[in-house]
Amino acid sequence: IEHPAVKNPMKYLEEKGYEVTWLGVDEKGHISLEERANAIRPDTILVSTILVNNETGVIQDAAAIGKLIKEKNPNTLYHVDAVQAFGKYPIDVQKMKIDLLTMSGHKIHGPKGVGMLYMRKGLKVRPFILGGGQQKGQRAGTENGAGVAGLGVAADVAFRSMKESIEHVKEVKKTLMDGILAMPDTQVNGDGLEAVSYTHLT
């Protein structure tokens, strides 16, 4: 269920000798908390979860997952891919016990090519791109000031109208689903109205 932006780096790490555990999902696209608990070991470095699936809109229970991770191994970092959720689903990094969160500007009508990485305060991560000391030494290279400003405005607009947007999309989605499901041999994939924004049918 992971987006290639997360899945492919994990495959790369496997090629470099890291052990990656891949978990399956149930018929609605949810990862079993029990299966996840069994997969976390004393040497588990990172758990990564897509909060909202980019094809079905299925929502993973990020708060329950975060709680589980920290109970099983407080040293395991928790990354959440929030690209499809940001501005469309409430996110509380403290409540969800998130250490790292990523999002992309173009998914909230911001500029293309700009995104955000949230890092829990005090967390030290070795930079991937070396050079200057931009972004507090976490990523070298001159910042795209206009892109960052555009992302800030887009985020402000998204969060200001998020509650109303969620309710409006639910109404439109229900009308669409009712119409399509009235046709023979159709079914909803995923969680239906519980999913974010998307309607995925066959």
Model regions: which residues?
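Pyridoxal 5′-phosphate
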Residues: 1-201
